Design a protein with these regions (language model features):
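Core beta-strand elements of the Rossmann-like FAD/NAD(P) dinucleotide-binding domain
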Residues: 43-45, 218-227
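An anion/pyrophosphate-binding glycine-rich loop and adjacent beta-alpha core
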Residues: 264-266, 273-418
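Glycine-rich loop(s) and the adjacent beta-strand/alpha-helix scaffold that form part
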Residues: 223, 227-293, 514-523, 527
Length: 534
């Protein structure tokens, strides 16, 4: 358990709290008798924030800056335990740094890119307001000392949207967490409490949310609040919810294991309606496997097995039946959201031959990346590939074989047996014929991606889709107020980040997961604080 930023104005307990709330709140229902009896202390604030990742941190800062007394909790031990200290970058709009350039990405351009790009699946009102809140979120980070590479520097309207909105983090872990701690410490009315997991919302007799029950290793705490913002990071660590919303998919969780869906379920129990769109922010490096150690790769030079890079090179992909299922160019060039087809099966596979392995280990990685792939990855990840040749590729393959997620065989028929890929021989025969003809009539893969698989021995690699977070959850109005099944506001309840029904299927713009989480946190924090005096 860790307690940071304690202010005498925000940290009040015991009988003092009960007396203070007697004149301002209706009677509070005990959400769970056992939890109520176990509560060892009671705290009071204006706004309680559940979760201190990207959205929760911004919500806490924004609410405090609007004059609210804020208590923000997280189940992690510290900021280092939140995924937000390890994310790659944020897609943001009209930050103070962007405005220094003539051709900066405008709010209108961002909206007109995202809304039609998602086929109008987004909540248009909340998308508009998230975009409007983006600059405040970006400036919190910039002014707070977070170091960025500004991918938008010098761009024009002809450049990719990824670069035009790109704020790429140059630090991770403790250096980034130190900045977050300093931001919180600078606000007298903000208390952060780590090692506390929100488990249930408190409601009054009218159904308004007026607090949260939190558990820690030291006991149960009741936080009484005039409003609660839930921003707990989705449900990637909840296998049952993954099966429910992603049709039995097996996902490698690249986050930190605290995102188990509790926040979404708390909101549902309080009467909030869950939305219809569920997606994932996929691993931008193409692949993962639960048998591997580490289980995924998300940037070059991270000590992970480069066999995970193969989908980025456009190699043939098959499902557990040994059959192709997509145009592999999509995986190479739109990695963040082309992971959607992978969710249809727990596993997918790529196959290469010895000739390809020999080529990979003797040529720079850049030779295997198309211009489309490079544009999709962005400058920060590309820098990691500068001058890299996978000279130890065969040793990497042997490691994958030892860990059980790769196999080697002298024939395609024998290779198929390793993972039960029944139709693989016929698939490779048809693929080789397409390579010879220079035309793929099955999934229309461009010829420059195609290379025959003919020279044994042959190799197969098994992958699970990897993801940073799930996307999708509780419906809100245009200002992050949770709504019920009638689209009426659940009083006192706000939702931010990936716990909200803010995204489309599939996830559309790379970097907007972190960027929109940050901005929605600002929006929720501003709204919750302003609603107190409305």
């Amino acid at each position: 358990m860790a307690l940071e930023g304690i202010s005498r104005r925000t940290f009040v307990e015991g009988a003092t709290v009960a007396a203070a709330f007697a004149g301002t709140m209706t009677s509070v229902q005990a959400p769970d008798q056992a939890l109520a009896e176990e509560a060892t202390e009671t705290l009071s604030c204006d706004v309680a924030v559940v979760g201190l990742g990207a959205a929760g941190l911004m919500a806490a800062l924004a609410a405090a800056d609007e004059g609210a007394q804020v208590i923000a909790i997280d189940s992690a031990d510290d900021f280092e335990g939140t995924t937000n200290t390890h994310t790659t970058g944020a897609w943001m709009i009209e930050s103070e740094e962007q405005l220094k350039y003539d051709h900066y990405l405008t709010q209108q351009q961002a909206f007109e890119w995202v809304e039609p790009g998602t086929h109008y699946q987004c909540n248009g009102k909340v998308l508009r307001n998230i975009i409007r809140s983006s600059a405040q979120a970006a400036n919190y980070l910039i002014d707070g000392g977070v170091q960025f590479l500004y991918a938008f520097a010098g761009t024009t309207e002809e450049d990719t949207m990824l670069n035009r909105g790109g704020h790429v983090y140059l630090e991770e872990g403790t250096p980034r967490a130190d900045n977050f701690r300093a931001m919180c410490a600078d606000r007298e009315t903000l208390t952060t409490m780590f090692g506390y997991k929100g488990v249930e919302l408190v409601q009054n007799d009218e159904g308004a949310v007026c607090g949260v029950i939190a558990e820690s290793s030291d006991g149960t705490v009741r936080i009484e609040a005039k409003s609660v913002i839930v921003a707990t990071g989705g449900f990637l660590a909840n296998p049952d919810m993954i099966k429910e919303h992603f049709a039995g998919a097996v996902l490698v969780n690249q986050g930190f294991g605290h995102n188990d869906g509790t926040g979404i379920k708390m909101c549902q129990a309080a009467g909030a309606q869950i939305g219809k769109n569920f997606s994932v922010s996929c691993n931008e490096m193409g692949a993962a496997n639960l048998k591997a150690s580490p289980a995924y790769s998300w940037a070059p030079g991270r000590g992970t097995n480069p066999c995970f890079y193969l989908p980025l090179f456009g190699n043939v992909l098959v499902d557990k039946r040994g059959e192709r299922f997509m145009n592999e160019q999509q995986m190479a060039e739109q990695t963040m959201y082309s992971g959607e087809p992978m969710l249809r099966d727990p596993y997918y596979y790529t196959i290469v031959d010895q000739a390809y392995v020999d080529t990979v280990k003797s040529n720079p990685v850049f030779d295997f990346l198309t211009e489309g792939t490079k544009a999709n990855m962005g400058g920060a990840l590309l820098m990691g590939f500068e001058g890299v040749t996978l000279s130890d590729f065969e040793a990497n393959i042997e490691e994958a074989i030892e860990q059980g997620w790769a196999a080697k065989a002298d024939s395609i028929e024998e290779l198929a047996e390793a993972f039960g890929l029944t139709n693989l021989p016929a698939t490779i025969e048809a693929y080789n014929e397409a390579c010879a003809a220079g035309q793929d009539d099955e999934f229309f893969l461009p010829a420059d991606y195609m290379h025959a698989i003919e020279e044994g021995p042959f190799y197969v690699f098994e992958y699970n889709p990897g993801a940073w977070v799930t996307l999708g959850g509780i419906k809100t109005d245009g200002f992050c107020r949770a709504v019920d099944s009638n689209n009426d506001v659940v009083a006192g309840l706000y939702v931010a980040g990936v716990d909200g029904d803010f995204w489309s299927t599939p996830y559309y713009q790379g970097g907007s997961c972190n960027g929109f989480a940050l901005a929605s946190g600002v929006l929720a924090g501003n709204t919750a604080a302003k609603d107190l005096v409305a």
